[in-house]
Amino acid sequence: MNSIEFPLLDRTTQNSVISTTSNDLSNWSRLSSLWPLLYGTSCCFIEFASLIGSRFDFDRYGLVPRSSPRQADLILTAGTVTMKMAPSLVRLYEQMPEPKYVIAMGACTISGGMFSTDSYSTVRGVDKLIPVDVYLPGCPPKPEAVIDAITKLRKKISREIYEDRIKSQRENRCFTTNHKLKVGRSIHTGNYDREFLYQPTSTSEIPPETFFKYKSSVSSHELVN
């Protein structure tokens, strides 16, 4: 009488089993399929357009550009943001579903760039309107730098906890479009007063009524008035 022989477990079985958590699985799925909304207002956006070509091929990162904010979870702001465009940018961000991310591309988006010294209508940094996850400096940044920024964002997504991110955004978001403009006497002669123009940023001089805590949904009209 032949005895019943049970098949031995394959040694490769342990390599084919994946153990993870729901949070890690959610992060992996989101970082592998980012759908960006392209918000370009100046020359920096031309550098991002070169990523669509075959030389850089940003499709390999799972990026699918969308034309509607309701279908996007990433917005790339490139170029100068003016006071008149500020409500539109905030409205686009509010229409994006959670979780959503922001990459500030270029010097004009991050700090106002060369227009921040003598322009009354330039927003001194897009982070005064919406929260920024990755800052990408440059004038303009190279396509390789854009890929590096997307890679850093993917690493950030892989380590985050969704509940903590939503709580942090609702408690720490502040908005303001009121910026002080001080014009020096020699600003049009090429002799800039560095101590006068480049002052350290401080929020203590800004009246508290210009800031709005993001504890509830705030309309775009309330953010700029």
Curated annotation (Swiss-Prot):
GO molecular function: 4 iron, 4 sulfur cluster binding; iron ion binding; NADH dehydrogenase (ubiquinone) activity; quinone binding
Taxonomy, superkingdom: Eukaryota
UniProt entry keywords in alphabetical sequence: 4Fe-4S, Chloroplast, Iron, Iron-sulfur, Membrane, Metal-binding, NAD, NADP, Plastid, Plastoquinone, Quinone, Thylakoid, Translocase, Transport
Family annotation (Gene3D superfamilies): 3.40.50.12280
Compartments, record wording: Plastid, Chloroplast thylakoid membrane
Residues annotated for [4Fe-4S] cluster binding in this entry: C43, C44, C108, C139
Cofactor: [4Fe-4S] cluster
GO BP term, pick one: aerobic respiration
Entry's cofactor comment: Binds 1 [4Fe-4S] cluster.
PROSITE patterns, alphabetized: COMPLEX1_20K
Function: NDH shuttles electrons from NAD(P)H:plastoquinone, via FMN and iron-sulfur (Fe-S) centers, to quinones in the photosynthetic chain and possibly in a chloroplast respiratory chain. The immediate electron acceptor for the enzyme in this species is believed to be plastoquinone. Couples the redox reaction to proton translocation, and thus conserves the redox energy in a proton gradient.
Entry's family note: Belongs to the complex I 20 kDa subunit family.
Subunit architecture: NDH is composed of at least 16 different subunits, 5 of which are encoded in the nucleus.
Protein's recorded name: NAD(P)H-quinone oxidoreductase subunit K, chloroplastic
Organism lineage string: Eukaryota, Viridiplantae, Streptophyta, Embryophyta, Tracheophyta
Gene name tied to this protein: ndhK
